[in-house]
Amino acid sequence: MAKGGGPRNARRGRLQVGSPTDARRVALDALLRIELDRGYANLVLPAMLADSALSDRDRAFVTELVYGTTRMGRACDWLVDRFLLREVEPEVRAALRLGAYQLAFLRVPSHAAVSATVAVVPPRSRGVVNAVLRRVSEHPVDPDAGPDSGGWPDLATRLSYPDWIVRRLLADLGHDDTVAALGAMNEPAVVHERDDGYVQDTASQQVVELLAAGPGDRVLDLCAAPGGKATAVARAGATVVAADSRRRRARLVSENAARLGLEGSVAVVVADGTRPPFAAGSFDHVLVDAPCSGLGSLRRRADARWRISEDAVERLARLQRHLVEAALPLVRPGGVLVYSVCTLLDAETLALDADLAVAHPELVPLDLPDEPWQPLGRGARMLPQSDGSDGMALFRYRVPG
């Protein structure tokens, strides 16, 4: 999504606050750090807010500006590029995106959006920012019009996603579900909190429920970080071995288990999930909540859509197959393996299940969950427009005994 060039590490230093434009100054600085330094939005913004003296109301406004502009960056670029005669430096590009987002996607009065955004750029750039944003304000896009009649040029631009994501989802979900799913993931994420205070999406909570582990069961969570599912399983009374391949992420599981008072029920192991160091048949349930493209949970990370590449999907699909193949021997006869991913792509869901049907015809698919889950071959899928949750796919198999 990057346009233009320029020095990295722009606008460093502690943020000085106190003027009416402070919120937009913080937002612009955050957008520059995300764009130029390739910083992660969910790390950059909280650190900057902590280093500011903004009010709670202004912090909420900055959060909406930064995450919203990041999500809708492609759409904002198209809105302003209609009226730009030349490429501009990164700070001006970021300010134009910021202004266009307020004009097109927020209920900010046009005069306020334009004047306050103009005020945060250097004096030499204020003329072009003012002129372009006024043109954007005067020429709103008709969402129902075609490309030749004042409408958006295409679906990917209107919804602000890379072409490949839209193309793949159209092929896998069809037009209506794709538009609804991508639109839902442009909305801010809903916070779901368990009764123990742990924040966990409802789709993830339902994966744990469908694992159906209870007191006396021995459960392996093969890709456990940050520990949401492992701790939920432990709360149900099971003994959990939580594995992760990276020591830092495994430490997150330990910290979360300790915070919830579950350290006695969750044993954390640093282990490569494709070569797990456990005895065959040693678990009643194995959960493979595999690394995936995350195309069902894009609302959680405003910049995720711009970071994932199409090439990564095939690499992740291969890893997912290796993880499931490594996990199957660990399930005792009569036990259950659950495979889950927060993606909507057939390559990471249906294709894997089809391979398992050929390689392991002995596996018995278990009953599908009810709505809002939808049938997905021998498994089920929840779309992100269903109930405010992430998109998720789930397959459950019993190992014959």
Annotate each PLM feature.
Residues 1-401:
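S-adenosylmethionine
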